[in-house]
C-alpha cells in the first residue's frame, strides 16, 4: 500500500503505518546507494522529500515510529572496501525544513524547550549547506591521524590516505591546540574543477561524470590515493567531534577558531538574532547560489551558544539545536495514463496514477500515489476540500506534479483547460481486484468518522494480503531470512504441491521436513539447486531463535512498527509475558490494559489493535504453531553504567520549575530511564512539581517512590 501524496493530517493511522514501513525500506535503499556506493538513483530533492514525508508522518503519529525509521538512522553502513572507523562521537544528520513556517516552528521549538520568552533573545548561526561528502578528521597532538566518512553515523570508512592529498586540509595544526581535535566538515568538488574534469574525460573518450557531489565522493573512495590527488577536492570545516578542550563557547567562534588553525570555512556564515534575519540571509544565499563555485542545497541554522546546545541535546539521529532549510524543488506537467489499484498487507486499496514519463529536476517520474477514493475526488480525510470541486483526477487528465516537501511525487492539481470531453470520473472499485471480496470503508475508532481508505474484507483468503504478510514476516527487520524474498514467497504461496506450499509463517519452518518426505524436490525446480536449497534451509534454521522485538514486529500487527515492538519487548521481557498481557487486556480495562497504555509511545489506538489481534482465533492458532518452531529470546534490558535511574520507569507531574517537561524527559531517557505518562504498579519514581494532583495521589496509594525536583536533580547528579 502506498499513500505518499496527501497531507499527513488527512491519513488514517493504518495508512500512516503502512507508508512508514514502505518509506523505511525505500530510504534505506537510497541511503545505501548514496552514502555507500555514490550512485544515487534519485535527486537530492526527491530524497529530501522522502525523508520529509517520513518525519511529518512521525510527528503526526508518534506511536508509529519504527526501530528502522530513517529518523533513527544516519547514512548507510560503511563499505567493506575500507577499514571501519568507530566515531568517538556519532556523526548525526540534521532535520530538514522547507518553508518559512517550518523555520519559525524550529525557532519556536528552541525557545519552548528552553523555557525562554520571545524577548529573551537567542542567537543563531546561518551558513550554506554544502552538497558534498561529510568527513571527520582526527588530530592527536596536532598531527592528522585518522579521517573517516560518516558511514552510518556510528561507524565510517577510513580514508586517511586520500584525505592527506587534499591541499586545503592541514596535516599538522599550530602549536597550542588541544591534544585531541576532531574537525568535521564537507569534502566537495568545485563546479569549475568538475567541468574541467569532464572536458578532460571527453577528450580522452571516456564517460563523463554526473555531478560534482558524486564525483567528489567517488574520488575520495579511490583505492589509489594518486587518483584522489588528481581530482582537486576541497573542504569546508563547520563542526567538530571529540575535543579534549573546547577553545570557544559559541558555534560561530568555534568555526572562526578552525579558520585560525588553517581550515577553510565558509565566508557566508553569519551570526543572527531573529527569525527575520535568518530568513533574509536564506534569501541572500539563494540569490548568490548560481554564482557560487560549489553546489549547495540549503542553509543550515544552529543555536550559537554551546551551553544552550548542550541543554537542547539530541533526538535519535539529529540535534534539537540545528536544522537545514532546503531550497525548493520543481514542478512539471504530465498526463495520467491509467489509474491502478494496489492491495496492501492490511487490505487497504490504494489507487496509483501511472503517469506519462516526465523529467522533474533531473529525475524521471512515472507514477504518483492517489491515496484513496476521496483524494481522487479532491477531498481530504477530514472531509475538507483540497482541490476545487470539479478537479477530480481522471485517466487522461493533464496534471501538475511536484517533487518536494512531504509529498513526493505529488499531484498538486488538474489542468482543467486540457481535460478532454470524453474524460470520465474514476469509479473506485467496491470489490478487491485481487480476490473479489467486498471492499468496505470502516469507521475510524479514533475519530468516529468514516475512514477514507477502502479495505478488502478477504483477510487471509486474499492472496495480496496473505503474501504481503509473509513478505513482511521474512523482511530485513523481522525474521530476515536470506534467500526467501518477494519472488520466492510468491513461488511457494502459489505452488500446488503441499510439500512446497508456504501460506502461513509456521510453514516456512516445516518446509525442509515436508520436502524430506516428498518426491517433488525443490532442488530440481528451475531457479533452485542443491546448494541454494541447502543455504535456504540453513538460513531458516538460523532464525529458529529470534530476538523478541523482531518476533513481535514480524507478526504484522496493525500499527506495530519496529519501535513499538522494541518498546513492548523491553516492557514485557518475554513472549509469554507479552502474550499473557494481551489476553488479560482483552476487556480493554484493568491493570493489564492500563499497563499497556502506560508504555511510552503506545497509544490507545495501537493498544486496541494489539488486543484485537490476539482476540482473533486464527491469529492465535498461527502463533501457537509458530511457537512450536521458533523461540523468541528474552529481551535484553538497556544498561546505563553508573546511572541510578537506568531501567526505572519515571513519571513527571505538576508544574515543573527547574526544567521544562521536554528537557526533563530527554535527560531521564539519556540516563536509561523510561518516562511514562501515567502512574501504574510498574512506575518506580514520580517526580512532582507544584500543583501535582491525581498522579501523585495514585503514586502514594501504590507505594511508589515520590520526590520533588530538587531531590530528582540530586539523584541524577549524584
UniProtKB/Swiss-Prot annotation:
Show the GO cellular component annotation of the record: cytosol
- Any idea which UniProt keywords this protein has? DNA damage, DNA repair, DNA replication, Ligase, Magnesium, Manganese, Metal-binding, NAD, Zinc
- Tell me the GO molecular function terms: DNA binding; DNA ligase (NAD+) activity; metal ion binding
| Highest taxon, organism lineage | Bacteria
Where Zn(2+) binds, per the record, is at 432, 435, 456, 462
InterPro entries in the cross-refs: BRCT_dom (IPR001357), BRCT_dom_sf (IPR036420), DisA/LigA_HHH (IPR041663), DNA_ligase (IPR001679), DNA_ligase_AS (IPR018239), DNA_ligase_CS (IPR033136), DNAligase_adenylation (IPR013839), DNAligase_N (IPR013840)
The record's CDD domains line, in alphabetical order, gives:
BRCT_DNA_ligase_like, LIGANc
Catalytic positions are 129 (n6-amp-lysine intermediate)
Which reaction is the catalytic activity of this chain? NAD(+) + (deoxyribonucleotide)n-3'-hydroxyl + 5'-phospho-(deoxyribonucleotide)m = (deoxyribonucleotide)n+m + AMP + beta-nicotinamide D-nucleotide
Question: Which residues bind NAD(+) per the record?
Answer: 44-48, 93-94, 127, 150, 186, 302, 326
Q: What is this protein called?
A: DNA ligase
Q: Which organism is it from?
A: Rhizobium leguminosarum bv. trifolii (strain WSM2304)
- Which Pfam families is this protein grouped with? BRCT (PF00533), DNA_ligase_aden (PF01653), DNA_ligase_OB (PF03120), DNA_ligase_ZBD (PF03119), HHH_2 (PF12826)
Which cofactor names does the annotation list? Mg(2+); Mn(2+)
What family is reported?
Belongs to the NAD-dependent DNA ligase family. LigA subfamily.
Amino acid at each position: 500500500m502506498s499513500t505518499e501524496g496527501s497531507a499527513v493530517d488527512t491519513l488514517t493511522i493504518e495508512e500512516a503505518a503502512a507508508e512508514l514501513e514502505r518509506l523505511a525500506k525505500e530510504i534505506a535503499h537510497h541511503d545505501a546507494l548514496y552514502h555507500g556506493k555514490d550512485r544515487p538513483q534519485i535527486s537530492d530533492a526527491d530524497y529530501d522529500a522522502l525523508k520529509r514525508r517520513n518525519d511529518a508522518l512521525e510527528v503526526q503519529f508518534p506511536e508509529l515510529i519504527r526501530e528502522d525509521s530513517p529518523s533513527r538512522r544516519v547514512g548507510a553502513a560503511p563499505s567493506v572496501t575500507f577499514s571501519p572507523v568507530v566515531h568517538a562521537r556519532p556523526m548525526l544528520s540534521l532535520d530538514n525544513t522547507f518553508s518559512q513556517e517550518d523555520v519559525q516552528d524550529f525557532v519556536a521549538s528552541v525557545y519552548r524547550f528552553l523555557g525562554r520568552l520571545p524577548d529573551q533573545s537567542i542567537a543563531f548561526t546561518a551558513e550554506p549547506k554544502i552538497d558534498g561528502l561529510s568527513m571527520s578528521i582526527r588530530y592527536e597532538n596536532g598531527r592528522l591521524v585518522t579521517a573517516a566518512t560518516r558511514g552510518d553515523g556510528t561507524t565510517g570508512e577510513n580514508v586517511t590516505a586520500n584525505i592527506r592529498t587534499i591541499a586545503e586540509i592541514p596535516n599538522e595544526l599550530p602549536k597550542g591546540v588541544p591534544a585531541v581535535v576532531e574537525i568535521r566538515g564537507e569534502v566537495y568538488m568545485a563546479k569549475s574543477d568538475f567541468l574541467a574534469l569532464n572536458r578532460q574525460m571527453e577528450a580522452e573518450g571516456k564517460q563523463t561524470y554526473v555531478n560534482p557531489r558524486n564525483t567528489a565522493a567517488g574520488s575520495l573512495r579511490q583505492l589509489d590515493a594518486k587518483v584522489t590527488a588528481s581530482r582537486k577536492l576541497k573542504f569546508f570545516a563547520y563542526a567538530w567531534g571529540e575535543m579534549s578542550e573546547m577553545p570557544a563557547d559559541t558555534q560561530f567562534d568555534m568555526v572562526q577558531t578552525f579558520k585560525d588553525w588553517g581550515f577553510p570555512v565558509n565566508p557566508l556564515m553569519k551570526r543572527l538574532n531573529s527569525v527575520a534575519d535568518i530568513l533574509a540571509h536564506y534569501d541572500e544565499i539563494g540569490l548568490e547560489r548560481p554564482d557560487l563555485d560549489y553546489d549547495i542545497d540549503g542553509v543550515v541554522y544552529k543555536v550559537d551558544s554551546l551551553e544552550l546546545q548542550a541543554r537542547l541535546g539530541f533526538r535519535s539521529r539529529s540535534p534539537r539545536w540545528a536544522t537545514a532549510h532546503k531550497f525548493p524543488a520543481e514542478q512539471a506537467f504530465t498526463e495520467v495514463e491509467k489509474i491502478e489499484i494496489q492491495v496492501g498487507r492490511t487490505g487497504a486499496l490504494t489507487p496509483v496514477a501511472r503517469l506519462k514519463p516526465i523529467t522533474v529536476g533531473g529525475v524521471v517520474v512515472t507514477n504518483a500515489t492517489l491515496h484513496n477514493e476521496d483524494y481522487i475526488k479532491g477531498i481530504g480525510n477530514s472531509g475538507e476540500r483540497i482541490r476545487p470541486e470539479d478537479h477530480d483526477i481522471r485517466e487522461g487528465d493533464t496534471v501538475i506534479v511536484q517533487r518536494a516537501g512531504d509529498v513526493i511525487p505529488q499531484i498538486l492539481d488538474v489542468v482543467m483547460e486540457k481535460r478532454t470531453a470524453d474524460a470520465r470520473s474514476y469509479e473506485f472499485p467496491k470489490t478487491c481486484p485481487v480476490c473479489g471480496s467486498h471492499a468496505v470503508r470502516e469507521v475510524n475508532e479514533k475519530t468516529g468518522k468514516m475512514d477514507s481508505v477502502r479495505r478488502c474484507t478477504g483477510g487471509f483468503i486474499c492472496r495480496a494480503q496473505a503474501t504481503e504478510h509473509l513478505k513482511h514476516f521474512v523482511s530485513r527487520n523481522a525474521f530476515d531470512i536470506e534467500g526467501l524474498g518477494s519472488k520466492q514467497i510468491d513461488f511457494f504461496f502459489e505452488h500446488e504441491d503441499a510439500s512446497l506450499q508456504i501460506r502461513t509463517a509456521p510453514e516456512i519452518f516445516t518446509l525442509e521436513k515436508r520436502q524430506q518426505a516428498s518426491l517433488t524436490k525443490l532442488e530440481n525446480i528451475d531457479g533452485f539447486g542443491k546448494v541454494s536449497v541447502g543455504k535456504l534451509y540453513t538460513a531458516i534454521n538460523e532464525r529458529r531463535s529470534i530476538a523478541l522485538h523482531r518476533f513481535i514486529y514480524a507478526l504484522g500487527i496493525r500499527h506495530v512498527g519496529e519501535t513499538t515492538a522494541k518498546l513492548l519487548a523491553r516492557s514485557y521481557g518475554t513472549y509469554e509475558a507479552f502474550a499473557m498481557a494481551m489476553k488479560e487486556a482483552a476487556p480493554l480495562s484493568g491493570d493489564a490494559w492500563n499497563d499497556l497504555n502506560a508504555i511510552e509511545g503506545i497509544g490507545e489506538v495501537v493498544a486496541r489493535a494489539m488486543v484485537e489481534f490476539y482476540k482473533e482465533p486464527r491469529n492465535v492458532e498461527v502463533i501457537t504453531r509458530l511457537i512450536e518452531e521458533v523461540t523468541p529470546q528474552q529481551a535484553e534490558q538497556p544498561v546505563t553504567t553508573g546511572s541510578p535511574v537506568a531501567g526505572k520507569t519515571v513519571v513527571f507531574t505538576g508544574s515543573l520549575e527547574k526544567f521544562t517537561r521536554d528537557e526533563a524527559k530527554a535527560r531521564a531517557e539519556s540516563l536509561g530511564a523510561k518516562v511514562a505518562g501515567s502512574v501504574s504498579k510498574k512506575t518506580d519514581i514520580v517526580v512532582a512539581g507544584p500543583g501535582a494532583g491525581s498522579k501523585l495521589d495514585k503514586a502514594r496509594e501504590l507505594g511508589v517512590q515520590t520526590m520533588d525536583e530538587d531531590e530528582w536533580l540530586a539523584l541524577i547528579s549524584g
